[in-house]
């Protein structure tokens, strides 16, 4: 829906072999953590291993397995979440292509096929942010 605004430009960071980027919800309403069905993080064509991906929102960090039952934390349209994974970024002076893929379920929209599932993607080019 709002795919070109998923990745917040200039938020790529790297620390201890992990890369992270801030992401915004590509939907117009808040969703509970249980509706974040999956994500992928790729830098310069290399994907972070799925089992290393972590989702941070509201100062809490979750694996995607933990998000399945998470109804206490919500992702709001005005708030950024952080997607991170084991993915070293070696050259912090170069421009890097960052891609985020998100899978969301929208529980209040029911179709003939069940609950609405959306997949959105965004790619941006940026340098590693200086901390």
Curated annotation (Swiss-Prot):
Regulation acting on activity, per entry: Activity is strongly reduced in the presence of chelating agents.
EC number: 4.1.99.-
GO MF entry, a single one: lyase activity
Cofactor(s), by name: Mg(2+)
Catalytic activity: 3''-dehydroisovitexin = 1,5-anhydro-D-erythro-hex-1-en-3-ulose + apigenin
Family to which this protein belongs: Belongs to the C-glycoside deglycosidase beta subunit family.
Functional description taken from the UniProt entry: Carbon-carbon bond-cleaving enzyme which participates in the metabolism of C-glycosides. Acts on the C6-glycosylated compound 3''-dehydroisovitexin (3''-oxo-isovitexin). Shows weak activity with 3''-dehydroisoorientin (3''-oxo-homoorientin) and 3'-dehydromangiferin (3'-oxo-mangiferin).
Name of the protein described by the UniProt record: C-glycoside deglycosidase beta subunit
Organism: Arthrobacter globiformis (strain ATCC 8010 / DSM 20124 / JCM 1332 / NBRC 12137 / NCIMB 8907 / NRRL B-2979 / 168)
């Amino acid at each position: 829906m709002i795919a070109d605004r998923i990745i917040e430009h200039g938020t790529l960071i790297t620390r201890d072999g992990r890369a992270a980027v801030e992401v915004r919800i590509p939907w117009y309403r808040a969703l509970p953590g249980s509706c974040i069905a999956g994500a992928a993080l790729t830098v310069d064509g290399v994907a972070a291993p799925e089992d290393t991906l972590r989702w941070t929102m509201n100062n809490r960090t979750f694996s995607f397995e933990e998000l399945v039952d998470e109804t206490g934390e919500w992702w709001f349209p005005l708030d950024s979440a952080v997607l991170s994974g084991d993915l070293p970024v070696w050259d912090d002076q170069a421009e890097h292509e960052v891609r985020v893929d998100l899978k969301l379920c929208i529980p209040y929209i029911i179709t003939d096929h069940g609950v609405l599932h959306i997949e959105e993607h965004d790619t941006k080019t940026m340098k590693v942010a200086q901390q």
